[in-house]
């Protein structure tokens, strides 16, 4: 697999949430409306220079306090790979923008910043129907890119492009004119010799419009640790169960959210007693978490021993209270306990709900980071009625959990005789819980299970049908997490006895 084939898996495709020509529109109809307005521009192909300018605008504007101030002149870009995705040609019965999407070129850029000596990579495109900037990992190495999170994006990339192709081919002249009318864009088209309508606008550049990077996590925790340090994220779990079980993605995500808020917290007595019996490192510690020493460095490897011990102890406690099912290749947790766990620690939250960009944006603006999860397995449940099998429900399991802690928006202004068409793409910043690897900005639309952001059952058989590494089903979030000091009594305890025969 080429570097691009691997990393293209990490891209998210666009959401057009700023377009509002229909009230209460679904995400899919909003995307379709934006494609109709884009058809009215008469042009959809950007030059590579314009595409790189969009990427540069994103990189310089989305800087956070955790990074040094970034200058546009500090970046150097290298085209690492490119690929073209082809689709069957479709004859469209419309005079406005009659071309179907036959092929799309995607580009993988590596970049470095000489001022802060950081390096990262990005997925881009020169086709505005897909988007100029698709994913940005500000600090990351392609060689470190092989993890489960990328496998999910590979499938989403294929299917999201297919969804875009279908939507583009579906719109007709009448729909384009209607959308333009609602957007208060007049359609005074010219007729060429081939009777093709041309509604030409001056295409603008994609630039960073707004975002909120004030809630970014200051931790880059993981499920074990690749460093040489004696105490790793899963050391306390290993001390209790005598096997190198991973902490689990939900455990790591929730631990990082707690480290962001730094609530007053004492280890749950049952967990502290169990840990004291098995691990001498906690001897003399009263179970009170000292967030200052736990977060002095983003990585556990560079903390003091006391800080390392408390981070490892926190991972053990959360895993236990989530009812973790431990494993050396992966540790799962009961997602039904997410909300109650936060409540028991004095945090109000809205529990698991369906993903939407507006929920993410509002939650970050009002409170801070939120939890996201995607399921990897779908199980249909049936009953027999008069000998005939009938589906009665569907359940989801497996997958991955991560933190969303920022959002950002890119916009493009297209003009014609004073009229303006504005296109918009929304991004969310994900801390995926692998020690900073692949933390970055991804297009929000891929998470929306109501529109394109899913792996179709008809296609997942290629690679991902009910495979644990893929979490294409039922992406949900726990929004509005915030400390209110109201501790709801929940009877947790050591929740799962590890299976020694796994």
Where do the language-model regions lie?
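Surface-exposed intrinsically disordered loops and tails
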Residues: 86-88, 199-202, 206-209, 225-240, ...
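Cysteine-nucleophile protease catalytic domains, especially the papain-like/related folds used
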Residues: 19-68, 247, 251-354
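C-terminal motif of bacterial Sec signal peptides marking the signal peptidase cleavage site
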Residues: 12-15
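Active-site-adjacent substructure of cysteine-protease-like catalytic cores
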Residues: 94-118, 348-426
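A recurrent domain-boundary module in secreted/ectodomain proteins
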Residues: 434-502
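Sec-dependent N-terminal signal peptides
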Residues: 1-8
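Acidic/polar, low-complexity intrinsically disordered N-terminal segments immediately downstream
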Residues: 1, 18-115, 130, 135-234, ...
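Catalytic Cys-His active-site segments of thiol-dependent hydrolases/isopeptidases
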Residues: 125-141, 405-406, 410-444
